[in-house]
A protein has these predicted regions:
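A detector for small-residue-rich transmembrane helices and their helix-helix packing motifs
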Residues: 1-198
């Protein structure tokens, strides 16, 4: 097994360390660094990035770090550290924009935390770059093509976002996927929604 590349390793360590701090002083960190809807009066500009370093539970942290390792490691080796960081930032910002829009429409006062937006951007990129790679998710443990995996999870996120009240920021996840899609198109020199040239 190849070693974890540096940016992915540092992010995994930083997120884990911050989560440990959350267990000690949760109110302080969440009030300053979670992504709060502007209407609450608790919003600060840096929160559109910092929220991605906080997590809501041990399981939340575990699955995000697992996904970061599974998909991010290979993409970092492919792109290099600088481009990889730029891509993660795009995913985090796009997810934040989507979540702020949804909370504004729904008049929500609940903050958002987690690297899931960046993770879904990585997932989308992996599916675009390695569409025929076979992967086996933890649940369901069924081998499937990366492209199929992305479509299934994207569809589930949309369905749960439209119908569910699970306390999960589904539209932030979808926003991360959109941000990842737009970055890949930009790097390829393609306009966002034009058809692929033959």
């Amino acid at each position: 097994m190849p070693p974890i590349p540096p940016v992915t390793k540092v992010l995994m360590l930083v997120c884990t360390a911050i989560f440990c701090l959350q267990l000690i002083v949760p109110a302080v960190l969440e009030s300053l660094f979670a992504l709060w809807p502007p209407a609450t009066g608790l919003f600060w500009p840096w929160q559109v990035v910092s929220y991605g370093l906080l997590h809501g539970s041990t399981f939340h942290l575990f699955f995000n770090m697992l996904g970061l390792w599974m998909f991010g490691s290979e993409l970092e080796r492919l792109w290099g550290a600088r481009r990889y960081l730029g891509f993660l930032l795009a995913g985090v910002l796009a997810a934040a924009a989507a979540q702020l829009l949804v909370t504004w429409i729904g008049r929500s006062s609940v903050p958002t935390v987690g690297a899931s937006g960046a993770l879904f951007a990585l997932l989308l990129a992996f599916g675009m770059l390695f569409p025929n790679r076979t992967i086996v998710p933890l649940f369901p443990p069924i081998p499937m093509k990366a492209r199929t995996f992305v479509m299934v999870f994207g569809g589930l996120e949309l369905l749960m976002g439209l119908t569910g009240r699970t306390g999960i920021a589904h539209f932030a996840h979808l926003g991360g996927m959109v941000g990842g899609f737009l970055m890949i198109r930009y790097w390829r020199g393609q306009s966002p929604f034009s058809r692929r040239r033959r």
